[in-house]
Every structure is written in structure tokens, then in C-alpha cells.
């Protein structure tokens, strides 16, 4: 396979997680009887531009269906993050009623609702019908298409250039990263700013976050790779912030390469130096990741088998994509994890892809009173522990598997 950005031949493997169905392909009682589509889940490293990427097997339309079940608004932590983002950007870049904000991957309007509340004109791009409908219900204008240069040029022709674009947790989700990034260069006004948030590859590898790898994530990103890709597609990076979200993310600020309005800030240089010092521009950094992932898999499986032998009941919390990667890689089935609780009604009464574990409402947890609750979205551990603190009443304990097994 050739690199999605620079077309170099890919020869360095990062990890092989076997085969699994798309992580958001939840099953209904009807589809439970049919066979599922499994795709290999292998990740390779480009030794030229250092873009880390999944091997090509699945098409985008097989991964992001009309009933895609991830709704951003079901995480209170994420809503607070979005509200603060809008407040910070409004202040930093002097946005007002004469400005125009465009969000790519607007999801259910979780972020643009705060721009709308401030009276700033905004537009969302969201190719998934279920979440697009939820955003429209909040009064947000949505274009239901995949983003790229072609769509950006159409907006420009309609006079819809952007003062600010937001793209949160989507840069990793696009198969054609060059066309996607080029779209922002086309869409921005001359002095416009594009922000991108994505999980930081440095954390993924150093903290063993292999369960954030799934088919919908085509790319795993460092600032080193992103800066190179942006420069090749008409954008220059002028600032970067490190965020706690999703186990450690970056927010990258970019402008049109021909803008020259803002100097590159010290944060960019510092982070590039840190990535270089960690070895991210050398092959040895990426070797050994498979072994660390295998340990998590083995430790979780051993814990679940031991709990079963001891007659303990174990439930899961959070029917998240990362949980599906972990459970399928570890070969966990309903005999070891009886059910998974999720607050999102769109997921309830369905089944996790691959492992086919039933998804239920939280009420079920209170009635069943399990001995252990495995928190699958470990990045929300504190939020979930607060929300489910009542399991302590029956001496229930919380479990997370990543970066290492933790019970208590």
C-alpha cells in the first residue's frame, strides 16, 4: 500500500488487531441473525512523512451509514469543552454577528449551538443523516455531504467563505486527507483561521491507547505529520495547544499559506522538538507497540475469566468504538461480559458489532447490581465513576483495561 499523503510505499507495521466489523456497525435483533462484514485492522507507518494510517480495506460508505450512532451531546464533558471552545475563539479572533463559522463534522450540533446562541452566523457540514437531523432540530443549517475541495469551492462561489472553521475529531476519519485539508485552504477568508482537534499519536503510543484504533480512523496524527500535510495543501500551522480530551489531544491552529497574517508561535516549535526527542521521526519509536497491546488483551481476558470462575457478575459501561476494538481484539463475548450500559437511546436494545454483547439502559444496572463495571471509554472514567457512584452501595467496583488493568 502507498501512503495516503505522499504516496511512498508503506513497509513499517505499527500493529495488527486482527479482523473486526466497523466499530459503529451496531446490530439490531433482526440483523443479529445475519453474518457481519469483517475487515482486517492493521496500521502502518510512512517512514517519509510519518503519517500513521490503517491499511486500506473498508470504504467510507461502509463505515459511516445513515444511522451512525455516535451523538456528541451524550457526553457532558464534551459539551463543556465545545462551549469553552466557542467562547475562546470568539474572544481570541473577535468573532461577532458579521463573522461566519463553518464546522466540518458538525454531528448533532453540539458545538454550533453555542455559536448560534452568541448570534454568530454558522453552517455545519455533516454527512450522517441521523446526527444531521438532530442538529437541524437545534435550528442549525446543515449540509449533508462529505467535505473536500469540491464542496469548499461551491461554498466560496455562494459567498460562504469562513472566518473560522472547526474540525473536531474528523481529520483522522477521512480517507483522502489531501483533498480534505485542501478544502479548508479553499474555504477560509484571507485572514481566516482553521482549527483541528485530534488525538495525539504521541499519547496513543506512549500510553498504550491501541483501542482508539478502528476502521473509521484512517490516520493517527502527530504535529510532525500534520504540519507537513498542511503545507503541501495550502495551510500553515501557527499555534498548537495540548488538550486532555480523548486521552490527550492537540488543537492545531492554521491559516492560509498565502496569508502570512500570523507568525508561527513558540508552542509549535516546542511540540515539534518534543516529538523529535521522543523519536517520532525514527522507526524504533513504533516497534514494540504490538507487545504492549497484547498484554492489555491478556490481562483483561484473564480478569474476566477469573471473575466468571468466582461467580462474579461483570457488566460494561459505554458502547463506544474504542470498547468494540478492545472487546473484539480480546475475543470477549456475552459469556464473560453480560451486557453494556449506554445512555444513548439510539444504541439501546442493539448489540455490539462482532462480540454481539447486548446494549441496555442504565436502569438495568441498578436492577442487576453487578460486582464489576468495566468502563470502556476510559477517557471518561471520572465522569462515569461520578455518574455510577451508587454501585458502591452494593460493593461494586470499577474496572478499566487501558493503559493497564485497574480495579477499584
Q: What is each residue range found by the language model?
A:
Residues 108-119:
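Conserved SAM-binding loop of SAM-dependent methyltransferases across substrates and taxa
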Residues 191-199, 397-401:
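Conserved beta-strand signature within the Rossmann-like core of class I S-adenosyl-L-methionine
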Residues 1-77, 241:
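N-terminal juxtadomain amphipathic helix
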Residues 97-107, 314-317:
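Conserved class I S-adenosyl-L-methionine
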Residues 166:
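A conserved beta-strand element that flanks and buttresses the S-adenosyl-L-methionine
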Residues 178-193:
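A short glycine-rich, Lys/Arg-flanked "PGG" loop and its adjoining helix->strand segment in the class I
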